[in-house]
Amino acid sequence: HGFVQNIVIDGKNYGGYLVNQYPYMSNPPEVIAWSTTATDLGFVDGTGYQTPDIICHRGAKPGALTAPVSPGGTVELQWTPWPDSHHGPVINYLAPCNGDCSTVDKTQLEFFKIAESGLINDDNPPGIWASDNLIAANNSWTVTIPTTIAPGNYVLRHEIIALHSAQNQDGAQNYPQCINLQVTGGGSDNPAGTLGTALYHDTDPGILINIYQKLSSYIIPGPPLYTG
């Protein structure tokens, strides 16, 4: 359980959507992060994969602000302390807003995957996962923005999928977090994307899986990685 509480973009700090505080405030600060109604700090499971809640978390609404990022620039997402039992992949997507991200219809966003990390080492099941590397990096994850994509406004969809109960159908726990970015530069690629409600199904091999057995490999969920 957890959420992104701070974001560092090209060395500049931006506050996250503090779901443990902001829903209870009459006038919460405007941020680049999307708001959610997940005040339990919880997740979306397979029963929500074909609903809008999987896109940017439960009841998500666009952040009012947008942060500039240079092509090849870095976005560091700083989480609340992540439970070490919650092993799983960390996946990052971008979707063009085709306009202002603060007013975008999330159900129309088409995401392409820009980074993925899954099972690192399975010598001693459940093994070492991307989530463990996130914990080791002081509960943070850094994603690099591709240099090849066309400039414009994008939603970054950053996600941990916790697999500690994934041996049961709908046992995997998705924690998507979205932020608004304005990518600058001279790229020209407009990669094909996938609607958020089509990213996952609850029987995908990387979603319905027992991580407490020896795994020869792990198939990271979602569409193929964009490599530029």
From Swiss-Prot:
One GO term of the biological process aspect: cellulose catabolic process
Applied use: Lignocellulose is the most abundant polymeric composite on Earth and is a recalcitrant but promising renewable substrate for industrial biotechnology applications. Together with cellobiose dehydrogenases (CDHs) an enzymatic system capable of oxidative cellulose cleavage is formed, which increases the efficiency of cellulases and put LPMOs at focus of biofuel research.
Tagged with keyword Transcription: no
Free-text cofactor note: Binds 1 copper ion per subunit.
Signal peptide: none
Reactions listed under catalytic activity: [(1->4)-beta-D-glucosyl]n+m + reduced acceptor + O2 = 4-dehydro-beta-D-glucosyl-[(1->4)-beta-D-glucosyl]n-1 + [(1->4)-beta-D-glucosyl]m + acceptor + H2O
Positions bearing carbohydrate: N138
Amino acids binding Cu(2+): H1, H86, Y175
Any Pfam family: AA9
Activity regulation, per record: Small amounts of H(2)O(2) boost LPMO activity, while higher amounts lead to inactivation of the enzyme.
PANTHER family: ENDO-BETA-1,4-GLUCANASE D, PUTATIVE (AFU_ORTHOLOGUE AFUA_1G12560)-RELATED
Protein name: AA9 family lytic polysaccharide monooxygenase A
Lineage: Eukaryota, Fungi, Dikarya, Ascomycota, Pezizomycotina
Gene from which this protein is expressed: LPMO9A
